[in-house]
Amino acid sequence: MLGIDHNKASIEEREIFSFTKKMAADVLLNIKEIEGINGCIILSTCNRMEVWVSCFEEFETSIYEILCSIKKVDDNRYRHCFIERGGYDAIEHLFYMTCGLKSKIIGEDQILTQVREALELSRENYCTDSVLETLFRFAITSAKQVKTQIHLSVVNSSVIHHVVHELKLSNYLFKGKKCLVIGNGEMGKLAATKLEEEGSDVTVTVRQYRSGIIEIPVGCNRINYGDRLEHIVEYDFVISATSSPNMTIHLEQLSNLEFKKPVLFIDLAVPRDIDPRITELKNITLYDIDHFKVETVSDEMKTQLRQIDEILKTKMDEFISWYECRGIIKVVQTLSENAAIDVGLRIDKTMKKIEMDSNDKELLAATVHSATNKVVSKLMFGLRDHVSAATFQECMVALKNIY
């Protein structure tokens, strides 16, 4: 895994390597064509971008250099922003990240959806393989189990909830305030809903070119995206949260407007939606997603995190067991079949002496064969679950010498 995230890179650096869904699909296909790579998945969110590959052990090509080539940037300039993980380290990272434990806001839910969508995008483009497919399915299933069994005691666990919470601590008030939310996607709807719950007068932008009825959160007003600047000076808060690679607000669009009262712009997107230069204008304050951080973890949460740790360790062990023994299934099937044939040969003389209709003898022989096959398979898979992978491999080698 090659990744860049909020821990090692600024928002300016992260946005260089972010991908829209269409861009990610194109890059997936390019990487999958590289000799030695069996599968590829790209995860691109507001806080991180990760390239996951399943490859042969002898594969030595740098994924980082491939990525820089695709993005047309100097591979020496951003190397410090990236981290590479492999083996157990990569597995552990994916499991904990999918649960939201590596997010800026611990336990946030959106990352689970984003990981699932990353897997689905790879599937749609035939870029995954059995190893990545199984790894991501294990991580997603584990995260669902965690969220079902353990409810983290984090107030305002989603991004917008945390943003509102932090702003309240800074004495910002929302009740009765006019808010413009640019973007009616998942994050935009979450933002609009939360602000409406806070008692704000919320307006949401919608695109004219979209066909059919466009749903917006209950209690909110709507305007066409193209009209977003007409009354922007009247708002107290302007939140932009789109997945577009293009900015929604440029300095040049605001420079001729007169902001008579303070307006807080909040940019929740990566790449950024709002031109950072707008802070040059009077009465304008801009916060991007890096401004909001979680500072403390409660004792109750620490206990819950230990419980989550136990669940994830168990699930990771299950995946590792599958990975280490994924080539053993055919061996077990062969050994079980050969053992069943051996049993059949050993009871053949006895079967011939039994006074029984030939059809019944054939049925009995088939039943014995099937039962032997199942019993031997059960014994071997049971053994696998109670010894180390190395010991199990040794046992398989020994049994292959017998059958």
Swiss-Prot record:
Catalytic residues (positions): 46 (nucleophile)
BP terms from Gene Ontology: protoporphyrinogen IX biosynthetic process from glutamate
MF terms (GO), sorted A to Z: glutamyl-tRNA reductase activity; NADP binding
Record Gene3D superfamilies: Glutamyl-tRNA reductase, N-terminal domain (3.30.460.30), NAD(P)-binding Rossmann-like Domain (3.40.50.720)
Calcium keyword on record: no
Enzyme Commission number, as recorded: 1.2.1.70
Residues binding substrate, per UniProt: 45-48, 103, 108-110, 114
Additional note from the record: During catalysis, the active site Cys acts as a nucleophile attacking the alpha-carbonyl group of tRNA-bound glutamate with the formation of a thioester intermediate between enzyme and glutamate, and the concomitant release of tRNA(Glu). The thioester intermediate is finally reduced by direct hydride transfer from NADPH, to form the product GSA.
Name of the molecule in the record: Glutamyl-tRNA reductase 1
Organism: Lachnoclostridium phytofermentans (strain ATCC 700394 / DSM 18823 / ISDg) (Clostridium phytofermentans)
